[in-house]
């Protein structure tokens, strides 16, 4: 009825307790290590997310206008478009307030239009523009080799020269620029993104160089009553969406209409 504790028994109990205590310490240490590693990973992810969020704000593009220029020629005329069609689509862009420099040459524009969906990149040089009307001595030409009087070269290159899969960029003087100059910064307060309404996904044409006068008719070119969705994706991934809605009727050839 009485417990007879011996020195050996008490020693065994003490060793067992010590082993349990050591095991508990090891488990606690491992758990602490896991918690520390998890906290470090969460902190790194939070910092990365914060940087991405900052980039999305600091590299966001704002739009100032969306305009279409009504064709001045009938379907069998010089620009191959009917008077119910547009000769040019342009969107004015600036950097959002507080934005860093934004390179439009690294910007992708996703367009869903009457003739499908395409990702467009900036035309930077004559390879991305139709040879028709190309004048290597004109400063209105992207990638020109010599400078001449810009006032005499307005008709050398325009939106109708932009090939499928590309957009062009105009400066504030209305002239196309190379990729190195297509940067929204303190020097370029506003630039204009220009699309060719004849080529996909706005129009039916796939190759500008293959278009001859009279080939395109009212249903072939983006024009009256047509709609398109444009997503401008900056190099950081910030997206600016624009809905283009062409009026049902155009009043005057050559007029600018709000889209």
Swiss-Prot record:
Keywords: Archaeal flagellum
Positions annotated as propeptide: 1-11
Biased composition (Polar residues): 136-148
GO CC list: archaeal-type flagellum
InterPro entries with a match to the protein in the record: Flagellin/pilin_N_arc, Flagellin_arc
Membrane-spanning ranges: none
Pfam family, one: Arch_flagellin
S-S bridge residues: none
Region of interest: Disordered: 126-157, 237-259
Subcellular location: Archaeal flagellum
Broad class of the protein's primary localization: other
A GO biological process held by the record: archaeal or bacterial-type flagellum-dependent cell motility
GO molecular function annotations of the record: structural molecule activity
Chain's role: Flagellin is the subunit protein which polymerizes to form the filaments of archaeal flagella.
PANTHER family recorded: FLAGELLIN B1
Family: Belongs to the archaeal flagellin family.
UniProt name for this protein: Flagellin B2
Name of the gene encoding the protein in the UniProt record: flaB2
């Amino acid at each position: 009825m009485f417990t007879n504790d011996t020195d050996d028994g008490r020693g065994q109990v003490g060793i067992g307790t010590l082993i349990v205590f050591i095991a508990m310490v090891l488990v606690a240490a491992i758990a602490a290590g896991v918690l520390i590693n998890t906290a470090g990973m969460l902190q790194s992810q939070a910092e990365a997310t914060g940087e991405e969020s900052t980039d999305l704000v600091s590299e966001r593009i704002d739009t100032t206008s969306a305009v279409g220029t009504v064709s001045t020629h009938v379907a069998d005329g010089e620009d191959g478009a009917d008077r119910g069609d547009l000769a040019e689509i342009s969107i004015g862009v600036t950097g959002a307030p507080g934005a860093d420099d934004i390179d439009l040459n690294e910007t992708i524009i996703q367009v869903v239009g009457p003739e499908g969906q395409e990702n467009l990149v900036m035309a930077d040089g004559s390879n991305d523009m139709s040879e028709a009307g190309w004048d290597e001595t004109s400063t209105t030409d992207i990638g020109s080799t010599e400078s001449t009087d810009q006032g005499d070269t307005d008709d050398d290159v325009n939106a109708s020269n932009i090939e499928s899969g590309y957009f062009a960029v105009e400066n504030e003087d209305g002239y196309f620029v190379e990729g190195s100059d297509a940067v929204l910064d303190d020097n370029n307060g506003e630039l204009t993104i220009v699309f060719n309404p004849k080529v996909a996904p706005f129009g039916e044409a796939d190759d500008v160089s293959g278009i001859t006068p009279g080939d395109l008719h009212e249903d072939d070119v983006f024009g009256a009553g047509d709609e398109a969705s444009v997503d401008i994706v900056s190099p950081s991934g910030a997206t600016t969406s624009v809905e283009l809605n062409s009026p049902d009727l155009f009043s005057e050839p050559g007029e600018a209409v709000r889209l």
